Amino acid sequence: MNVLILLGIVSLFIFGRKVSSNWITGIKDTLNKMMDFSTDRRLFSSWTANPIGWTRNTQCWARAYNWSGTAAGIMGLGGVGGGSLISRRHVLLADHVPYPARPFEIFFVNRPGKTFTYKVTKIDSVPGTDIAIGTLDQDADPSLVTYRVLPNDWARYVQGLTIGTAMGIEVVTLRLPVLYLNQEKMVSTGDIVRLVSGAAQVEPPAFAPAQAYYQVQRGGDSGNPIFVQVGDELVLLGAWHQIGVFPWILTHKGAIEAIIGQKLLVADLSGFTRVA
């Protein structure tokens, strides 16, 4: 069966039903439907070296979402270092990763399975963070998704979120289910439980059915992305810095926009009920 037809059938099952107006409840409902399909967490089922290319895994449990804006690999690093499109010309990276000398090749695969090769010509760092922005040699193909970020008022849609202080530092406590990739491009799920000084902390999910889809991070996962689900869309939150921790992209939104010379795309939460 054609890959796009299959994805359409799966998406209709997962997203075609009425979902809860509560954002977090809707995420859990969608996770349940996704887990009914498969336990296979691999985005890709195979790859070839000559010509270089990847085959999308039609059995991946998270295949209904659009992962085409996440890099399949980087020449010389494989799946290490991540790379997610935040504009047609820019990718989110991790500053501490020893990326190859510029220019280096980065690869993306669209939903039908075509591999695209670009060159990262320079990398800019966001001062005081582990965020780096790579510039591509040309605009990414329109068939590759550019990811949005959360709106500034996202916290008003998260029930149970609290804001406190510890040693004079603001600490946000919450339970926000997320999806994330590792260096093998496997999709796992966890919960953001704290935001401290512009960093998000991820732990195993409290949602019992999702616990089998959690995997702890390890060295080499750096730069790979973390997303939250907003309806049928993946919204980018950041990229792995160290085990269980990543820079919260919204904290550094202004600095990122200054580097890329444009505004980041913003997701729409207005269809959900505000709880705060």
Segment roles from a protein language model:
Residues 1-15:
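Single-pass alpha-helical membrane anchors
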Residues 162-209, 217-218:
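Flexible, gly/ser-rich surface segments that form the specificity/activation loops bordering the active-site cleft
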Residues 13-52, 85-97, 192-211, 215-276:
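C-terminal subregion of chymotrypsin/trypsin-like serine protease catalytic domains
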Residues 51, 85, 91, 132-136, ...:
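A structural motif
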Residues 90-100, 140, 174-176, 180:
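A short alpha-helix/helix-coil micro-patch that ends at or immediately precedes a cysteine
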Residues 31, 99-163, 183-192:
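Conserved catalytic-core segment of clan PA serine endopeptidases
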Residues 59-94, 127, 223:
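A conserved glycine-rich beta-strand in the N-terminal activation segment of trypsin-fold
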Residues 87, 102, 128-132, 172-175, ...:
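Residues that flank catalytic or metal-binding motifs in active/ligand-binding sites
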